[in-house]
A protein has these predicted regions:
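Positively charged, small/polar-rich N-terminal and surface patches that mediate targeting and assembly
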Residues: 1-120
Length: 120
């Protein structure tokens, strides 16, 4: 059932697979930190090819495990949540790109009352 329909912020964090935070992959460290800080959720996507500010092409070849492949972390949050998030990113990211955009979120969850108050 639809339980949320409204405006939120989509944060996209673009980093490299070889980026580290205290000897741990940056994406894993960010996920752990965001969970610990009480954020609603985050998803990590591993790319198969890409290039960044230096125009160096990074690709996945069959004979190599990786060439510093792109990693995308997506977070959907409130505006206040994004305000809490930015200082964490400032602390943990040394190189990368972060975008924030306004999105319409429609959330469905089982066993909850729908927005119109009627059960189907």
């Amino acid at each position: 059932m639809r339980v949320l329909d409204g405006e939120q912020r989509l944060v996209r964090i673009f980093v490299g697979e070889s980026d580290r935070w205290h000897h741990q992959s940056l994406s894993s460290a960010l996920l752990e930190r965001l969970r610990r800080e009480g954020f609603a959720g985050a998803t990590v996507f591993h790319g198969t090819a890409g290039f960044g500010a230096r125009s160096v092409l990074h690709t996945a070849h069959l004979l190599r495990l990786s060439e510093d492949l792109p990693v995308l972390i997506e977070i959907v949050e409130t505006e206040d949540g994004v305000a809490r998030l930015i200082p964490i990113l400032d602390e943990m990211i040394t190189e990368g790109l972060v975008t924030v955009e306004t999105v319409r979120v429609i959330r469905y969850a089982p066993g909850t009352r729908p927005l119109d108050g009627k059960r189907s």
